[in-house]
């Protein structure tokens, strides 16, 4: 019985570790595709009903709206570049959520947060929000 429990624990742990490895690959690929302007590959990482929140208060886009916004930026083979500084994960079942600290030459340090879902055995980004980080010391009281 103890062996069965141990084997079950090890299998569950490995599945979770594999999931997080797959999701890290998904997001690392997202940022690489954006950097290289790989439009189809970039948007292929999102679910068909994904939502993207940009840094401006008006930037709440369905995936189709986000594609329209991004197409000109990707047209010359360059999108945008964010370097991943750190990433954290939580979740269970077919849903995971994450936060990541990014660096962009124009915007400085930013935070990306999002939700990924396992859809047809493939992790897809269902929600992504990009925010600029503002130190508390310079924020208005």
Regions found by a protein language model. Give the residues of each.
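Short, low-complexity N-terminal intrinsically disordered segments enriched in polar/charged residues
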Residues: 6, 12-44, 48, 64, ...
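Short, linear, compositionally biased motifs with a strong N-terminal bias
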Residues: 10-11, 125
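Short beta-strand edge/turn micro-motifs at domain boundaries
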Residues: 111-138
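Surface-exposed, charged secondary-structure patches
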Residues: 19-22, 67-108
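Sec-dependent signal peptide recognition
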Residues: 1-7
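Short hydrophobic/aromatic-rich beta-strand segments that constitute the beta-sheet cores
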Residues: 52-53, 98, 125-127
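A mature extracytoplasmic/lumenal domain signature
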Residues: 46, 56, 86-88, 101-104, ...
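A short gly/proline-enriched turn/hairpin at secondary-structure junctions
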Residues: 50-61, 72-77
